[in-house]
Amino acid sequence: MVNTMINKTNKSSLDVVGIGNAIVDVLTTTDDSLLKRLSFDKGSMTLIDENKAKELYEITTNRIQKSGGSVANSLACISQLGGKAAFIGRVKNDKLGEIFIEEISSTGTIFKTPTSSVGPSTARCLIFVTPDAQRTMCTYLGASVLLEPKDLDLSIVREAKILYLEGYLWDNPAAKNAFIKAAEIAKNSGRKVALSLSDSFCVTRHRKSFLTLVEDYIDILFANEEEITSLYKTSNLNFAIEQLKKKCELAAITVGKNGSILISNGKEIIIDPYVLGKAIDTTGAGDLYAGGFLKGLSDGLSPVMSANIGSVCAGHIVTKLGSRSSADLSNLIKLHLNINI
């Protein structure tokens, strides 16, 4: 089997480069009645067009606008933990694009992808957070779908210890081609390739392609229970895990308040959750889990310790509204795991 550990003597100047949708999150708190009126399934992610995005924006109140996107959130976490990260994604040169660039750059994450001057506006995700901390997302992908192979900074892809890919990109053919090109370059450069399945509906749309992708390119897989069971067309999590063991060396399956299941060298290891306060918003839990996990791996730590780092980061972010935190994450890791990263 391929060794998924990162050699501590690796002198790469970059820990992780991520490719994903460059999105601005627009968060608002609401109750179940609004979701029912809008015919949204609580906890789901729905793709919407620009007109619908404008309509929903107008009915939201007490908005919090933050740079977002699943992989971008993970990279921001890595940077906050002292890692060196870079992001590849497309925004337009509009107001939301400025917000995205300013905030992702403020975390220390490298962002050099050229902006679009024409075409769709910057992507946004309207996130409705209910009192039970569930988030229902409506996403307008906008300029993010314009990502194509020529946008790749090949030197960065070759340099980073880990390439992290966002499953949502599979919805757009040009972005999908960029995705595959980056994975091939990373593998040919001796780097590790990680994938987030992103969303159960995304998995359903592209199940066959994802299964091939996991088998051919992926060293590290992130998914939640709904996504991994969707991948293997089953309602039985244990069955899905057994299938995954045959195809993937290292995977982390998050199971909400029950923590996560680490799959490493064919073994299952339960990673307990870290409850660091009352959960008020689960928006960034999976993203920060992946960020902490990848930071640990890039430092040469074991998969178990890396998963625990991810669990602490996830346990912290659910106590905040949104998917970014200004807290000293490294200090939290030292406090709860007694290690310095």
Question: What role is predicted for each listed range?
Answer:
Residues 162-242, 258-260:
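Conserved beta-alpha-beta core of the PfkB/ribokinase-like small-molecule kinase fold
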Residues 103-120:
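A glycine-rich helix N-cap at a beta->alpha junction
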Residues 2-17, 22-23, 36-42, 184-185, ...:
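Conserved phosphate-binding/catalytic region of the ribokinase-like
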Residues 2-88, 98-99:
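Glycine-rich phosphate/adenosyl-contacting loop at the front of the ribokinase-like
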